Amino acid sequence: MKNYGPISSKVTKMLHGADYNPEQWIDMPNIWGEDVRLMKLSHTNVVAVGIFSWTMLEPEEGKFNFEWLDEIMDLMHKNGNYVILATPSGAKPIWMAHKYPETLRVAQNRVRNLYGERHNHCYTSPIYREKIAIIDRLLAERYKDHPALILWHISNEFEGQCYCPLCEEAFRDFLREKYDNDINKLNKAWWTKFWSHTYASFDEIEAPAPHGEPALHGLNLDWMRFVTHQTLDYYKHERSILKEITPDIPVTTNFHDYISLFRGIDYWKFAPYLDVVSWDNYPYWHGERTDDHEGSRIGFVHDLNRAILNGKPFMMMESSPSSTNWQPVAKLRRPGMHVLSSLQAVAHGSDTVQYFQWRKSRGSSEKFHGAVVDHCGHENTRVFRDVTKVGEILSKLDDVIGTSVEPQVAVIYDWENYWAINDAQGPRIEQKDYFETCQKHYKAFWDMSIPTDVINMDCDFSKYKVVVAPMLYMVRPGVGERLEEFVKNGGTLVTTYWSGIVDENDLCFLGGFPGPLKKVTGIWAEELDALYDEDVNYVSVEEGNSLGMKGEYEARIFCDLIHSEGAEVLATYKTDFYKGMPALTCNNFGEGQAYYIAFRNNDEFLSDFYSSLAKKLTLKRAIEIDLPKGINAQVRMDEKNEFVFFMNFSSEEKTIDIKDLDLTDMVTGEKVAKEMEIEPYGVRIVRRK
């Protein structure tokens, strides 16, 4: 497969660095010089600057101060560092909020916010767009030829919603365009005759509100789409200015940490306007989940971000080299975990390891957030040594830059599907757990070290051998037909209970569930039984089934009551009034097969099911050797090279028998012994010949 090349043509090294906020220390000029010394010690070669610097750059309206930034840009270049320069729109100045209150967001209760925190701005506001355009243009013109500049970082962690009059009118315009200015089309799409909610004109429509209209699911869904649309439109506004002046400088925006998968912005919509994907990675290590479980959750998001640009390496723009200050418990990373967590990103496709932030703030809300340089101000800390070790390892990985992977497996996680599931009134109000369900299916492949993409339902299915679509409640137009074509041409589809229920407007399909998936799955889903937490049913695997599975498994939370309409029954329910009904089926369709899992299950079932499926389909693993529990392997490659990352997500030393494989350690340059040892929370990176 091809090599994508480096993120910037200016630098052919793995990027290692941090968000750098020198303006916090502008009254202590000796700090800047000390920062440079420490950056060299830690093998730092890139810093992200200016993310929250609007007030420092424009202390009064129309009065600009770039001298300090000039000095920083020159200082970084002189000392061999590159700069990712941010636009400062993530946090606006106080003067703007007071002079132009329309730039402040309005909450869902229709009360305008006071000035405070960050992200407290309206993306629709013409004033806000005007003011950011001025400063973006000045930044681009001033630094377009600066040798340190390698990337634009637009704003910071886009999130949030605004319900001001400007946004409500923009929402109405969005709806007018979507429904061809025909209010009758909207009424049909939203099923407004229920409860007498029919609209006579677009002017009557208000955004969802707890004290207004929260019950029209079509309205709620279109509002979430609008939020993404308006956020993206704002991003494009900033991007257009930078691209006009610096067309050859790549542009990104940093996506939020994995909690963003439950939030209101569909990152797939940004794909056409990103030169590189970047995201902020903040795992919950050493918590209630085991570290290998947490590792699989983070792997899920890494693989999603890699898939957004079709396999192109991404950037881990932020991470903590230690603890955070906003997670419920700020548990320190155990020895080795920082290196493991950092290199896991590289294993899944990142060409950078970056931190928030370089030096701990002395005050304000993130003064206790982990950073490379602690309040002590020197290099003699455990965290600094860990960061330095990461930098040393990255300096040996130049050949890994631009490599990727071509997975045979894809798991569908779709934001619009999540919004629709979360909004549905039933079959359980709580614990629908769409993300958790998708992640559990993903984990079964991660546990086998089978490379996997995480995609949405609009992606191309044809390049995969297996597409897994858990809880595909919403099926947008054309998706059912494309899945049929995928299976017909030899692909394997796995879907589950509560799939094929509604269309893109959250209107239920008529003619039987799973709607557009009914034909390809060869089943009819008649009812869905929602169980209480303490309830349990059991599923018994049929003797002599085509997957060769055996045994009995628990069924909890959801049990779909399905009928075979041509599909092979692989397992049946063991108890309750639906005893004997199918619980797992396989339908031969064209050259491929479609599996339907009718019940929510535990890791044991998914592990056994996907292990059997992987064996049947001879799915490629990162490396074809037995790996001990707790070890995950990922692979990156191009036409010339293949690199395998062995990662130990356990607190115990592990030994791997590499058989007769010819492996060279990328860090030491030595040939790997037949018995390869990996220390607790350790990583080994090898080149395979």
UniProtKB/Swiss-Prot annotation:
Cellular component, GO annotation: beta-galactosidase complex
Keywords: Glycosidase, Hydrolase, Metal-binding, Zinc
EC nos: 3.2.1.23
Signal peptide: none
Reaction(s) the record says it catalyses: Hydrolysis of terminal non-reducing beta-D-galactose residues in beta-D-galactosides
Matches recorded under Gene3D superfamilies: 3.40.50.880, Glycosidases, Golgi alpha-mannosidase II
Single GO BP term: galactose metabolic process
Recorded GO MF terms: beta-galactosidase activity; metal ion binding
Binding site for Zn(2+): 122, 162, 164, 167
One Pfam family, short name: Glyco_hydro_42
Family classification: Belongs to the glycosyl hydrolase 42 family.
Protein name per Swiss-Prot or TrEMBL: Beta-galactosidase Pbg
Natural source organism: Clostridium perfringens (strain ATCC 13124 / DSM 756 / JCM 1290 / NCIMB 6125 / NCTC 8237 / Type A)
